[in-house]
């Protein structure tokens, strides 16, 4: 059987990124304390109680999914902004973007009797149009309960991010991201993975927070999940992370359709909240635009 490497929170970031480059997945153990775990469980319980199971084999007939986590759990906001995770995401995605954004948030609860999910690569959400050499996703799964092979721990095929797209793994190449509650599994958008089979009476609960380059469309529509009247309650850092910021000098501006005085014409999204604006808030020079047209 394949193996997912497990490391401690004080492991040097260079080593973490080296493992991610080699295997496309690793577990950092004991990141969250019991208080944080209890807060997340309490925040999510009302939504999980009323959410219906999936309606197909991929989403899982015994699996519940709850999104819009930034609006539903303050502690999940803290996870999204976790300093180590964001530092790793910035370095990992950095070769292919100026900055990154929150791409997806979901609490996924695999119930008793659930069957395993088909192995897949998350980068497929963009339809296969992006060259494989561009890594599009830095993903995290926070274990709110223990993850075991028996209760549906994520299946993953270490090293499969370097395979031909049509190669299928042998049974002995599949590993399980087993971890204690409070740990986090980090993986890439190019590695084969999928939810596991739950042969227990337990519920396996994880918080999935994924990051992507800020020039790509997000899987979870952040602006409908968190419209301005909700996003105004977030910190400026979280607003920027979910996309209320520009991704380049002329990427991501907005215009107020009700503005009859021309005050909010093609401005940076931060302006709507009165936040400090970033380096893209100034007018681009012709040199900026020309240099930004190609990295070669």
What are these regions (language model features)?
Residues 108, 146-147, 190-191:
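Short Ser/Thr-interspersed hydrophobic loop/turn segments at strand-loop and sheet-helix junctions
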Residues 1-23, 29-119, 123-129:
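Non-heme Fe(II)-dependent double-stranded beta-helix
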Residues 167-186, 191, 196-296:
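Conserved double-stranded beta-helix
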Residues 27, 101-103, 156, 186-187:
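A structural signal for short, well-ordered beta-strand segments and their strand-loop junctions
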Residues 113-178, 216-226:
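Catalytic core of non-heme Fe(II) oxygenases with the double-stranded beta-helix
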Residues 33, 77-81, 133, 175-178, ...:
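Aromatic-acidic/polar surface patches that form glycan- and anion
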Residues 104-107, 140-142, 207-211:
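A structural signal for short, well-ordered beta-strand segments
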């Amino acid at each position: 059987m394949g193996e997912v490497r497990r490391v401690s929170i004080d492991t040097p970031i260079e080593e973490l990124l080296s493992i991610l480059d080699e295997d496309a997945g690793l577990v950092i153990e004991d990141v969250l304390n019991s208080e944080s775990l209890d807060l997340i469980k309490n925040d999510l319980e009302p939504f999980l109680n009323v959410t219906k199971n999936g309606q197909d084999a991929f989403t899982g007939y015994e699996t519940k999914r709850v999104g819009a986590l930034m609006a539903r759990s303050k502690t999940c906001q803290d996870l999204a902004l976790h300093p180590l995770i964001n530092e790793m995401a910035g370095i990992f995605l950095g070769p292919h973007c100026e900055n990154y954004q929150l791409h997806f948030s979901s609490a996924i609860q695999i119930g008793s009797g659930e069957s395993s999910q088909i192995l897949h690569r998350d980068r497929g959400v963009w339809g296969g149009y992006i060259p494989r050499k561009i890594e599009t996703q830095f993903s995290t799964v926070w274990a709110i309960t223990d993850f075991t092979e028996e209760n549906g721990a994520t299946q993953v095929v270490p090293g499969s991010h370097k395979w031909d797209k049509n190669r299928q793994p042998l049974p002995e190449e599949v590993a399980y991201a087993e971890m204690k509650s409070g740990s986090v599994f980090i993986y890439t958008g190019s590695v084969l993975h999928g939810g596991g089979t739950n042969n227990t009476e337990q519920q396996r609960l994880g918080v999935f927070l994924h990051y992507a380059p800020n020039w790509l469309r997000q899987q979870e529509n952040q602006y409908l999940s968190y419209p301005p009247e909700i996003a105004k309650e977030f910190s400026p850092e979280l607003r920027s992370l979910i996309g209320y910021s520009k991704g380049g000098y002329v990427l991501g501006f907005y215009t107020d359709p009700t503005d009859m005085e021309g005050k909010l014409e093609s401005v940076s999204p931060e302006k709507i909240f009165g936040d400090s604006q970033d380096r893209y808030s100034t007018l681009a020079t012709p040199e900026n635009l020309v240099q930004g047209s190609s990295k070669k």
